[in-house]
Regions:
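Short, surface-exposed loop and linker segments with low hydrophobicity and enrichment for Pro/Ser/Thr
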Residues: 1, 88-90, 135, 182, ...
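ABC-family P-loop ATPase nucleotide-binding domain
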Residues: 1-11, 277-281
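ABC transporter nucleotide-binding domains
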Residues: 5, 12-186, 191-192, 196-205, ...
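Short, charged/small-residue-rich alpha-helical element at the C-terminal edge
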Residues: 215-281
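Serine/threonine-rich low-complexity intrinsically disordered regions
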Residues: 3-6, 70, 108, 185, ...
Length: 281
């Protein structure tokens, strides 16, 4: 059984500039992968290649076994770009109907209404785009990306214009898509949001993969914090197996131990370190 997305040794050159160099990435059905990197890292180029909008210089990209850019592959993809624009005079329902026709979807009015309800626009289907907030337009973008029940969903900054309640709603939507078996590639600068929802993360910098794995795998141990009557004491070189000895030594020294916790780095810290290491190499 082929992966939802399989990228192998992907290379993209623009003249003498290497936008991507030997990038590998796979996403399985029902898996949500975060794509992280600074501006100019190559993220947008990678997504455009997956969509078939840009041809790679080398390597292989397939969507459920179909070469990227083929008609069969494009029919399996839903895409929400970071920058999008819908006609101001169109209503939400008209935008959805237009994209159904562009996608040659077999969906009907029922599909449109179900998707608008799914993204929280059930009561705004007759509202014109010009009267929508940026957050509502972003929800509409999510709705159009889901037309035709895509098996691979590419989301570029899907929560950037949403308030906290809207971001929670998107997280719940992503969980529902995961249950349905939809594969998702999520590009976002909101690392706290990414950390909450993804199964794996790939970090690229200057066109090269600098880190990949689950958030737990990428988190580096940062020692042990012990709370005593005198406050929190940090043991930077300690690991889990060192905790009993640390506690025993403190108790023997007459200290009262109230709490012990392992310290690990956040995804933001891992990201900053990976990008810094990649820039220095």
């Amino acid at each position: 059984m082929s992966s939802a997305l399989a990228i192998s040794m992907l290379v993209k050159d623009y003249g003498r500039h290497a936008a991507l160099r030997d990038v590998d990435l796979t996403i399985e059905d029902g898996e949500l992968v975060g794509l992280l990197g600074p501006n100019g890292a190559g993220k947008s180029t990678l997504v455009k290649i997956v969509c078939g909008l840009v041809r790679p210089t080398g390597g292989r990209v397939t969507i459920h076994g179909h070469p990227a850019g083929s008609v069969a592959a494009r029919r399996l993809i839903g895409y929400l770009p970071e920058l999008f624009r819908y006609p101001d005079w169109c209503t939400a329902d008209e935008v959805m109907r237009l994209h159904q026709r562009l996608a040659e979807s077999t969906g009907d009015e029922r599909e449109r209404h179900e998707l608008l309800e799914l993204v929280g626009l059930a009561d705004a289907r007759d509202k014109r785009v010009e009267a929508m907030s940026k957050g509502m337009q972003q929800r509409l973008g999510l709705g159009q990306a889901l037309i035709g029940a895509p098996r691979l969903l590419l989301l570029d900054e899907p929560t950037s214009a949403l308030d906290p309640a809207g971001r929670i709603a998107v997280r719940e939507l992503l969980e529902e898509l995961r249950r349905r078996g939809t594969a998702v590639l999520l590009n976002s600068h909101l690392l706290s949001e990414v950390e909450r929802v993804v199964d794996r993360v790939t970090i690229i910098n200057r066109g090269v993969t600098v880190a990949t794995g689950t958030p737990a795998e990428l988190s580096r141990p940062g020692g042990v914090d012990v709370t005593t009557q005198d406050g929190v004491r940090h043991f930077p070189d300690a690991a889990r197996e060192d905790i009993p000895g640390i506690v025993a030594d403190l108790v023997a020294a007459g200290e009262r131990v109230y709490d012990v916790s392992l310290v690990t780095s956040s995804l933001e810290e891992v990201y900053l370190q990976a990008v810094s290491d990649g820039a220095a190499s």
